[in-house]
Regions:
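Phosphate-/polyanion-interacting regions in eukaryotic proteins
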Residues: 86
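Exported/periplasmic ABC-transporter solute-binding proteins
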Residues: 27-70, 74-81, 90-98, 103, ...
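Bacterial N-terminal signal peptides
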Residues: 10-22
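Bacterial N-terminal signal peptides that target proteins for export
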Residues: 1-13
């Protein structure tokens, strides 16, 4: 019975995908640049898009912002090929203003919350309120946060809201070009904070939970077509699929909240 149900869901996903991707008859090579927040769900969904359309997807990963070698703005500046850009919404807005992405192609895909993680088997601190999180951060010897959107918020706003900016100066560090969860899993930080969707795929950690509501920063991840794309129609079809009901279950399982009607 279980295998029958799984087979049925697979058939339904394929059928739904075919409907959403109707009109992409000729195979294409689609270059995608994507930041970490949506990567796990995207990686799970791309094979279905490729199978249904015959298109081949070539993916480059990197932060939505910053100056590291893999950051999406840096990749674009180097002239790397791109058809689809998937990153933090306001970072995509910046690329649109710079003439590097097509303005009317923007689609908001998901909302993403920040979570807290510890090494597997370690005691889970109380983070049920802002005061509890403050105590946990002050008690921790080492703290890690990302070099992308969540880390910018944590280091420039959240610590200040909690009144612990000075105390965090020597114990909290920004992690460039590496998932924060990997640092926590290796025991190099007692507490890690990053998008829940970026924490979930990493083994060796336990997710304590999301930040308290009064400290939470929900990040919108959006997709758009890169200016100068060689395959804009195939790129639009991929974005349409990622925003479709066929992708919803995979996105939710990755710790994200799909945005309905995200087209701008």
């Amino acid at each position: 019975m279980r295998s029958t149900a799984i087979h049925f869901r697979t058939l339904m996903l394929g059928a739904a995908t075919a409907l959403w991707l109707a009109g992409t008859a000729q195979a294409a090579e689609v270059h995608v640049m994507i930041s970490g927040g949506l990567s796990a769900a995207y990686n799970a969904l791309v094979p279905e898009y490729e199978r249904t359309t015959g298109n081949k997807v070539i993916t480059a990963y990197g932060p939505s912002m910053g100056t590291t070698v893999n950051a999406i703005p840096v990749r674009l500046e180097r002239g790397e090929p791109a058809d689809v850009l998937i990153l933090v919404g306001y970072a995509l807005d910046d690329l649109i203003k710079q003439g590097k992405a097509v303005a009317d192609s923007k689609v908001d895909l998901v909302n993403s919350k920040i979570g807290v993680a510890v090494k597997s088997g370690s005691p889970k601190p109380d983070i049920s309120s802002s005061d509890a999180l403050k105590r946990a951060l002050l008690a921790a010897k080492t703290i890690a946060y990302s070099d992308s959107a969540s880390g910018v918020y944590i280091s420039t706003e959240m610590f200040n809201k909690l009144g612990i900016t000075a105390e965090m100066k020597d114990k909290a560090r920004k992690i460039p070009a590496t998932p924060v969860a990997e640092i926590v899993a290796r025991g190099e930080a007692e507490i890690g904070m990053q998008q829940i969707s970026e924490l979930k795929p990493v083994h060796g950690i336990d997710i304590v939970g999301p930040l308290p509501d009064d400290l939470q920063k929900v990040t919108v991840f959006s997709a758009g077509i890169a200016k100068g794309s060689k395959e804009p129609e195939a790129g639009k079809a991929l974005i349409k699929f990622l925003a479709s009901p066929a992708a919803r279950e995979t996105i939710v399982n990755a710790g994200l909240e799909p945005i309905v009607g995200g087209a701008k």
